[in-house]
Amino acid sequence: MKKLPYIIILFIGFTSCKKALEEKAYSNTYTKDFYSNAAEAEAAITAVYGNLYGMYNSGAPFFASDWSADQTFPRNVVGRNTLTQFSYDAAYSVQNSFGRVNESPMEIWKRAYITIESANWVIAKVPATPMDAVRRDNIVGEAYFMRAYCHWTLTRNFGSIVVKINPTNSIENTVVGKSSIDEVYKQIFDDLTKAQQLLPDYTPTFVKGRVSKQSAQLLHAKAALYNEKWADALTNAKAVIDSKKYTLVPSFTDLFTAAKKDLARQEILFDVELNNTTNPVRQSQVHFFYAPNGSSDYNKGGAGGIYVYSKFYNSFITGDKRKDLLATSYTNTAGTFVPQASIDTRLATKDLVLMGKYKDPNSVGAYGSNNIYLLRLADAYLIAAEAEAHVNGASANAYSYINEVRKRAVIPNLTAGLSQQAFIDSTLQERSWEFYGEGDRWYDLTRTNTFLTVIPTVVNADYPVRTPTAKNRYFPIPQVEINANAALEQNDDWK
């Protein structure tokens, strides 16, 4: 069979269990008997969420972005260091050779299109499913949201991408060319408009992990921010805030305490729901990489390997509670105090900083229960602050939005009387303190085109020189995908 540019997988089942079907191009005959009742429609949308889990459990969306930025870095080993050193090529040759594909942008491309494919089938088939009409609309709205999220994930990583809005039912319709970035965003906004119309408002009785109308509004706001549609970003961020459906968790530490993740749901608009069981469907392994080797406070099976730059650690305002999840020492399982210089003797850098956002002392080996947060209410406030400043300058409203986040961090209100640009810069800094380790910072640097000046200043003994160039704003489209799709062209800077 001809190799497809997208790996196409459909999961079916009548419970939370999922069965992967043989990889193949779909036909109408192949799917004619599915989506015929409510149970199958529910199974189909559950599979869409499950496919997204496959992307995030690998860590690729975090690692590809965070290791390129100025907050966290990986242990300097071959294959893992190419993102931090900007030494990858269009074929991701080193990652392929040294078994690091699951940490690379290749995984983002593959998993995003798997999820889009499954969402497309829901959008195409479920509207005709005989079932409760309200729930049917909700399911289709969830699929529109997920398709928008994946297209947005792709475009912020790769720039111009293939927009895929129809399910694959032949080999021929997999040979599709790229759309411009503007065209991609048009599709994203169209999908999110439909999602908002079909999704319900959030309530505390929501099924865990499901998206709401407010989730679609916040994703719309964030996509508009990236697309520099400031008024649109402001309108949608304000809609989330003004709905009062979500509230900030009072304690930043509680927000990232695995045992309190039900409490955290009051702030989380979209996440990947995970657990610490040996069930391979919903394991979390993100915590495994951030924990020092042998620390029951972090988890029961951590290997270490991802650390925080000391420059970022030292950037916090005195008393900022967000810094409490960073540490320069730890106590190991034997009860021995481990000082900063001995955190990881494999590295040349001796001013290592540990990150505790993904601690899980009740982990089962490599499996933790930390959910992965993709959209939370703090983002709505900071998007509103930045967008308001672009539209109306450093207004009282702009200050009120950013200070809401600073209040939770227990730091003073932002200095009054800032210029428009100084306020926007302060908002970007606030985002850095708020969302470190959540796969966000690199995109703030690239969308503002500040990565070329910021990154070279963030170095250490293991990465003494870091020199991104203009082409690093977007990752190259994996060469294997271009080889499989005659209509797909590489990004101009990577040809």
Where are the model-predicted features located?
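Bacterial Sec-dependent N-terminal signal peptides
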Residues: M1-S27
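Long, intrinsically disordered, low-complexity segments
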Residues: S16-K18, E23, Y35-A38, G54-N57, ...
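Conserved, well-structured interaction surfaces
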Residues: N37, E42, T46, G50-Y56, ...
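Flexible, polar/acidic helix-loop-strand segments at domain edges
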Residues: L83-F98, N314-R376
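TPR-repeat structural position
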Residues: W230, A394-S395
